[in-house]
Design a protein with these regions (language model features):
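An N-terminal hydrophobic leader/cap segment in hydrolases
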Residues: 1-58, 64-72
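Short coil/turn segments at beta-strand junctions that form active-site/ligand-binding loops
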Residues: 77-78, 104-105, 148-150
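Conserved alpha/beta-hydrolase
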Residues: 97-120
Length: 162
């Protein structure tokens, strides 16, 4: 099980620019590796050889933890942005991530403010604009770094309302 202290340690260990997979270095801390293993997010072979990186998207108010799962270029059909529901987090979406990867979609998924590994009071928000602001920040970073298109968005519960 992962505590808020673990979440803070993982968050503090992540880079700000994480959409760059050109580095051959393994930069996952043991705690991040444990998190990925615990939630079944270590996809090896069954997804066609995807790569993973994680990092921070900061919007000034929150540190948003974002995961980027990339299928090999020759298989890419586009990018699926997954938005989770209230009280959920990335770790609960392993089956959906795997399914998208198997279909040839790169996946971008992030924890909403106050959820999962992202900063903020637990499941507490002043306005839905804070959630949509976090998503827009992720989209801006993805656009600036030319994340593979076309883009699709899949949202569940609160994620669908964003």
């Amino acid at each position: 099980m992962f505590s808020r202290d673990n979440a803070e340690q993982i968050r503090d260990s992540l880079p700000l620019n994480f959409f760059n997979l050109n580095s051959n270095k393994e930069e996952k801390t043991p705690l991040l590796q444990s998190y990925l293993q615990y939630y079944g997010l270590n996809f090896t072979g069954d997804d066609g050889g995807s790569k993973h990186c994680a990092g921070i998207v900061s919007n000034g108010e929150f540190k948003i933890v974002c995961h980027y799962f990339v299928v090999p270029l020759e298989r890419q059909k586009g990018t699926a942005f997954l938005l989770h529901g209230y009280f959920d987090h990335t770790g609960l979406y392993g089956h959906m991530i795997r399914h998208c990867l198997q279909l040839g979609y790169t996946v971008v998924i992030f924890d909403l403010p106050g959820h999962g590994l992202s900063s903020g009071p637990i499941a507490e928000i002043d306005s839905f604009r804070q959630y949509s602001g976090a998503f827009l920040r992720v989209l801006r970073q993805a656009k600036g770094l030319k994340v593979n298109q076309p883009w699709i968005v899949i949202g569940q519960s609160t994620g669908a309302a964003i």
